């Protein structure tokens, strides 16, 4: 059986996390040549490349498996040494989360865990359609995703759904939709997307108004909180989780442009199996809070 030296695995992990050999060397306090040598040792051991040497480097399929193994072992090792029960070194937890969860329910859900255990979070923000891929690549130990099926050697639980409403300010609605939300009016109304791969707005318009993707003007803004600000100031119409704008809707600062229509995204919590004690606490906290604030039907 091929048993990798975890020192060499940490070199592979550093290259991926630091997005290059030079910064990985600085992180590990060794030379860049030593980093390359350790990864070469790993590749010789497994008889195949573990890195695709692009900019930034990315792991091969075998490299992803090894990184996942490393992160799981590190979690279990830290807990075995007692670092999650009063030890001096905070336990690093890398999680992939979507921006809307981070802006609404995720941090309150994690509050009791953070208060109870010395944890250092590394939250990697990614669209909910792509967070599971970070888990597959071994970059994180848990992910909030819309994918219901678990990866091999992983566990999954349903968290609940975020309901997205198509909203804008009243002045925006009066300007762009004086006769209601129509197909022709939507073609002129500025919208906003999180990034070029965010299809939430386009999917809603295609499903309900038969508008093809790319047919409406769309800003690109990588911030869930900025979506709310853009809508409040009358700059755009956009899809925002109901959970995020309850106060604005109640006060009339924002209005639901299409009552009776919404976009529902069911969320799932993925993580490696077996769970460490700390990850079990995280899972319990996310499931408990998610079932209080997310739609369960």
UniProtKB/Swiss-Prot annotation:
Pfam families tied to this protein: HTH_1, LysR_substrate
Keywords: DNA-binding, Transcription, Transcription regulation
Origin organism lineage: Bacteria, Pseudomonadati, Pseudomonadota, Gammaproteobacteria, Enterobacterales
Superkingdom of origin: Bacteria
Domain HTH lysR-type: 4-60
Organism: Yersinia enterocolitica serotype O:8 / biotype 1B (strain NCTC 13174 / 8081)
Function: Controls the transcription of genes involved in arginine and lysine metabolism.
Protein's recorded name: HTH-type transcriptional regulator ArgP
PANTHER family in the record: HTH-TYPE TRANSCRIPTIONAL REGULATOR ARGP (PTHR30579:SF2), TRANSCRIPTIONAL REGULATOR (PTHR30579)
Designated gene of the protein: argP
